[in-house]
Each structure stands twice: as C-alpha cells, then as structure tokens.
Swiss-Prot record:
Gene encoding the protein: OSBPL9
Ranges in a coiled coil: none
Keyword Phosphoprotein in annotation: yes
Residue ranges of the region described as Disordered: 231-368
Name of the protein in its database record: Oxysterol-binding protein-related protein 9
GO biological process: one example: lipid transport
Length: 736
C-alpha cells in the first residue's frame, strides 16, 4: 500500500452547522490523517488539524452510503465522501492503517520484542508448509490418470496450473524474505531501537539510516528490528512485513486541483519530501483541530468510567482472552440473589409472573467497559459491512433471556392488542392496530445497557400468557387446544419456536380466544458490523387477524441498531415499515428515524394512516417510540396517540422451571442464565458452549442419517412460517 493517500472530503463543523470542503492526506506509516483548507495550504504545510489513527474505530451509517466517522481520543469526527465508491476507498485505506498501528501497539504493550531469530523461525515454518504443498501437488497427477470425463479433466488441469503458479509465487516470496533477513543481519543498527516514525504535518519521512534493499521488488524498505514484525499470529497475511515505500526522488506526483468546483476522487500517491514543508514535531498525543469547532459526539463517553482513548488492554489481547490465566479475570463478585428469585415463575398466586421482567441491568453497565479489550479483539477480526451471523460473541454481553422470549414483549400491552377487535368501524380498527404496533417496542428494553439475547437453539420453544386487566376469576374455561392449554379463554397466549438455524428464523403466534383475534409472524435476523454499531435487519412479516371481520393486517418490522458498542451500548430502531389490510384498503406507513450523525433526537417515529384510495393521510403521528407519540387528524383534532411512560406493562406469566419441557427456553438456558446472574462468566461460557456443541452434534447425526429436521409447532407456507393450529383453523373445524 502506498505511504500516502490524499484527496478531497467534506468534514462537519459546528461553527458552520454543516459540511466544509477540506483536503485530506492519509499517512499510512505515521498513522495520521491530516487535513487542510486546500491543496495549496497542504503544499505550504499549513495543517488545519489531524486525526490520530492508532486505536481509532471507523463507523458507517447503514442508511447513508457517503458518510463515515472516525472515533478516537474521546471524539467522533464526521466525514462525507462524494459517493459510495469514494467512501469505500477511504475506508479501506483507513482500516489498513488503523489495523497496522493497533497491532503494533498490541505487540509493544504485551512486552513482545520481535527479533531476527523470530523472523527466521517463521521462515522455516513457511518453508515446511511449502514442502507439504508441493507433496500435495503430486496428487493432481493421480487424479488426472483416473479421470475419464473430459470436462472434469479440464477442471483438474486448470486447478493444477493455478496451484503450480501459487507455489512458484510462494517460493519467490520465501527467497525474497530470506534476502531481506540476510541484509538485515548485515546492516542492522547497533542498538536495534531506532524508530522509523518521523511524523510531520502530512507525510512519513524515512529515517536516513534506514537501509534500502535494491534487490527486492518495488525497492522495499526494511524497517528497524523492534517494529519490523508483529506477532505472526496477530498479523493478517494482507499486511506487509514492513512499510513498503518507493524510492523518493526529486519529482512530484500530480495531485487533484483543489480549485475545482466539485469533488474529485482521492488520489493514492507517493509524495517526495519536498512536496510539503517538513516539521520536526512528533505525532500529536491527541487528535486536534485549529479550533475546537468540529462536530464530535463527546457525550458518547460521558457514562464510561474510564477513558476510551486506549482501546487495547495494556496486558495485550492474549492474556485477556485466556480466562483462566488470572484465575478469575472475567468473573464478577458473587451475589446473594438466588436462582429462584430470577427464574421461578409459578402458576398460581402472587408468584405467577415473570420476575425476569423486574430485573435492573443498569448495575451491569461496567461489564462491557471492563471487557472492552475482548470486544476490540473480536471486532478486529471483522470488516465493515460484514455479516455477523456466524461470529461468536463474548458471553458477558448476553442478556439473560432468549430471543424468543424477547419477541413476547410485543404483547406487553395485551389490552391494546385485543381492543383491535372491539372497534366497530374498519377505520378505527386500523388506527387501533397502529396504536398497538407503536406501543409494542418499548417494553423490550428496560435497562439502560443494551445487551444481546441468546441465539435460540433449533427447535427451542417459549410459551407464556397474559391475564387482561379486567379479567375476573370467574373466566376459568381453558383453551385446551390452544398454544398454552392451561390458561383461560380470556387470556392472551403466546408461543414461539426457532424453526431454522441457518438462516436464523424465529416464528411466533399469539391469540385471544374470546376476542377472536390472532397474530402470526416470522423474523429472520441478519446482523451486520457497522464500525461503532451493529445493525440487525429484521426480515419477515406479521399478520394481525380479526376473525369476526375476516380482516388481516400485514405488517413489517423495523431494523435494530446497537450503538456505542465500545462504551455503554444503547439500542435504536430504524427503517420504514408498512401495515396494510387488503380487505378494507386501509394502510399505514411508519418510519423509525435513526439519530443522524450531526445532531437530532433519538428514537423518533413518524407515521401516516391512509383511507382506501386516498393519497393524503387522515391521521399523522409523530414522537418517540419509547416515549410519547402525538396524533394529528385531518379534522384538526390533536391528541396523545400513545404514551409509553404511562401505559402499564402487564407482566407475562411463565410456567415454573421444573414444570417446563427440556426444549423450552428457560429450561434450555437455565445454567447460562444462573451463571450470568451470579456473574460467573467462565461458567456461563462453558454452559453456552455445551448447548452449542449439542446442537452441532445433533445436526451432524441428522446429516449422516439423511434425516430432515421437523419443526414442532410451525410449518413453512411459501415464504412464511405459520402456526399449525391457529384459532382461525380451530374455529372453522368446530363449525363443521
């Protein structure tokens, strides 16, 4: 990679309350992103400010393809490229720079000082692997002799040629590395501790003592011994052994003209030392601007007990990931709270409801902060936009419940749900559906710290029910054929099942027999890494069915985002959702607004409800999905639509643990939940690992026996997952 990349970007400033054009120079070797008001100012060395990249984190917005952020030194700087392609170029270059300097910091902090002997050892290992590969090459000849089909023979020959070419390249690389080692032995410095980093206003200046190996391609510069290599286990193969620089001559590389009216693509080029006025100053200790008017999210760290400016644990990643190295490095102090207080959920009396709902996770805010280095190690292995479905997350960030149980929180206001069928007019029923829908999200998160629920095991089930506020003890007739057969017909019952593991799909169903209303949904969760955030796309749909009116309201779900994942995480929702009733023609458009990079409020929603064939809505709703939402009707009436602060949350009721089947959520996860409760992270991790291994073993057994997995309560119908015995089907059968 070139030592310097430069070009125009826009940078947000608070003074102007908007974007300002700046000329940026990325110095790969110094780990510095400097910016100037123009190209001319850059050539004169008049730097406006700089961003240190060691330990920095890049963030992107899933809904905006041109902006990105760099978070470092307790500040978040906001940038805007011309388009998605230009942003991708900058992000790729910045990621490589950050990774290089962060890995160097890891190596230095852990006390590891690489030597030529370490280099030689790795060369020997590489040569041994090469010999194994050469032996494997001989198998191609056997394959060709036994191959009868011409088409298959051509494929094998092509693969053999490609492999031969790769082997030759590896041979060449090993020879060049050997030459570099020999040259280093001959010319290395006496003290072996001279640093190559001479940071200046814009570019990296090689040390005059640094040897240039003329026999190597592109005239590779071999760095001094202490920083020439990181631990081989930590350095990705895509990174060079040392900084690769072309010999700096007296010519200048042309750069884009800063006087142009529009953006031009960033130019990656090597620049001569005469290109700018060099400064003897070292890299600034902190990122800075000539005036602190830049937009950054200073409040992102105000809840954090320690400064996030050093994102790598001083003990190095190796010691952090070895839980047993210090005995209790990841354990939390014991608590006197018993398992029963958090998990026992009876079937009668005052102990009926779920005490999980009364938990307060605020006290656990520190766990994410104290294990930040583990998260940093984990996220150093992923790239922006990468699918996180198969990435194993550390146990301490888990919430003490399954994702299936979290979906039950859609019905934390069951009275609003069943009142849909009480409305006599189709217009009022649509308004009530929207009201219930907008009230359904806030109950899922009561603590201030966002955590991730357990990934359900294939075939896992969760069952619960709610007693309506005005329900009396006289309504004792049970729904024997319903999803929760031990409750009365006036209750709202809920059941969920993990119907697929790859992709992860959950299906859930709820009903109220007496109100003749049911709900069926399926959600496929797809996670994506966004730098400072994790995005979860909820792919799927739900259907509210009012059976007395033969109406079906199809709805979609917003995406979820875990923000500030390196400090105190918080959750927001984002995306456009729709609710449609094909029979009546009523519809609603709902937008969950994510907090913009530059100002704005969190958790905003706007909604429009439309009559059949009308392009203008008869009701507009705006507010916060976890706060107060206001409705404005076409008649001029203004009213509170939903006030989640005043709405009482009705507790769900779950069978006692000892009464549950083995595959029910709380029974499956009881060991993980208990150990998370007492903050024994090692034991929780081990319990989680046992569950996952059992699931893998069962999958292998089914594959060997060629057996298809059979779901318990749901079946696939086209692209949807439908409950086997919904209320609609049971009522229809009863009529015949």
């Amino acid at each position: 990679m070139a030592s310097i990349m430069e070009g125009p970007l826009c940078k947000w400033t608070n003074v102007m309350k908007g974007w300002q054009y700046r000329w940026f120079v990325l110095d790969y070797n110094a780990g510095l992103l400097s910016y100037y008001t123009s190209n001319d100012k850059m050539m004169r060395g008049s730097r406006r400010g700089c961003v240190r990249l060691r330990g920095a984190v890049i963030g992107i917005d899933d809904e905006d393809d041109s902006t990105f952020t760099i978070t470092v030194d307790q500040k978040t700087f906001h940038f805007q490229a011309r388009d998605a392609d230009e942003r991708e170029k900058w992000i790729h270059a910045l990621e490589e720079t950050i990774l290089r300097h962060t890995l160097q910091l890891q190596g230095l902090d852990s006390g590891f000082v690489p030597s030529v002997q370490d280099f030689d050892k790795k060369l020997t290992e590489a040569d041994a692997y090469l010999q194994i590969l050469i032996e494997q090459l001989k198998l191609f000849d056997d394959k060709l002799q036994n191959c009868k089909e011409d088409e298959q023979r051509k494929k094998i020959e092509t693969l053999k040629e490609t492999t031969n070419s790769m082997v030759e390249s590896i041979k060449h690389c090993i020879v060049l590395l050997q030459i570099a080692k020999d040259q280093s032995n001959a010319e290395k410095h006496a003290d072996g501790m001279i640093s190559t980093i001479n940071p200046v206003d814009a570019i990296y200046q090689p040390s005059p003592l640094e040897p240039v190996i003329s026999t190597m391609p592109s005239q590779t510069v071999l760095p001094p011994e202490p920083v020439q290599l990181c631990k081989s286990e930590q350095r990705p193969s895509s990174l060079p052994v040392g900084p690769v620089l072309a010999t700096l001559g007296h010519h200048q590389t042309p750069t884009p003209n800063s006087t142009g009216s529009g953006h031009s693509p960033p130019t990656s080029s090597l620049t001569s030392p005469s290109h700018v006025n060099l400064s003897p100053n070292t890299v600034p200790e902190f990122s800075y601007s000539s005036s602190e008017d830049e937009f950054y999210d200073a409040d992102e760290f105000h809840q954090s007990g320690s400064s996030p400016k050093r994102l790598i644990d001083s003990s190095g990643s190796a010691s952090v990931l070895t839980h047993s190295s210090s005995g209790n490095s990841l354990k939390r102090p014991d608590t006197t709270e018993s398992l029963n207080s958090s998990m026992s959920n009876g079937t009668s009396g005052a102990d009926l409801f779920d005490s999980h709902d009364d938990r307060d996770d605020d006290a656990e805010a520190g766990s994410v902060e104290e294990h930040k280095s583990v998260i940093m190690h984990l996220l150093s292995q992923v790239r922006l936009g990468m699918d996180l479905t198969k990435v194993v997350l550390p146990t301490f960030i888990l919430e003490r419940r399954s994702l299936l149980e979290m979906y039950a929180d859609f019905f934390a206001h069951p009275d609003l749900f069943v009142s849909i069928s009480d409305q006599k007019d189709p217009k009022d029923r649509m308004v009530q559906v929207v009201k219930w829908y907008l009230s359904a999200f806030h109950a899922g998160r009561k603590g201030s710290v966002a955590k991730k629920p357990y990934n359900p095991i294939l075939g896992e089930i969760f069952q619960c029910y709610w007693t309506l506020p005005n329900d009396t003890e006289e309504n004792t007739e049970l729904v024997s054929e319903g999803p929760v057969p031990w409750v009365s017909k006036n209750s709202v019952t809920f059941v969920a099942e993990q119907v697929s593991h790859h992709p992860p799909i959950s299906a859930f169903y709820a009903e109220c027999f007496n109100k003749k209303i049911q709900f069926n949904a399926h959600i496929w969760t797809k996670s994506k890494f966004l730098g400072m955030s994790i995005g979860v796309h909820n792919i799927g749909q739900g259907c509210v069915s009012c059976l007395d009116y033969d109406e079906h309201y199809i709805l979609t779900f917003p995406n979820g985002y875990g923000r500030s994942i390196f400090t105190v995480p918080w959750v927001e929702l984002g995306g456009e959702c729709n609710i449609n009733c094909s029979k009546t023609g009523y519809s609603a458009n709902i937008i969950f607004h994510t907090k913009p990079f530059y100002g704005g409020k969190k958790h905003r929603i706007t909604a429009e409800i439309f009559s059949p064939n009308d392009k203008k809505s008869f009701c507009s709703v705006e507010g916060e999905w976890n706060g107060v939402m206001y409705a404005k009707y076409a008649t001029g009436e203004n009213t509170v639509f939903v006030d989640t602060k005043k709405l009482p949350i009705i507790k769900k009721k779950v069978r006692k643990l000892e009464d549950q089947n083995e595959y029910e959520s709380r029974s499956l996860w009881k060991d993980v939940t208990f150990n998370l409760k007492i903050r024994d992270i090692d034991a929780a991790t081990e319990a989680k690992h046992r569950l996952e291994e059992r699931q893998r073993a069962e999958a292998r057994e089914r594959k060997e026996k060629e057996i298809q997995w059979e779901t318990r309560l749901f079946h696939e119908d086209g692209e949807c997952w439908v409950y086997d015995e919904p209320l609609l089907k049971r009522l229809g059968a009863a009529k015949h």
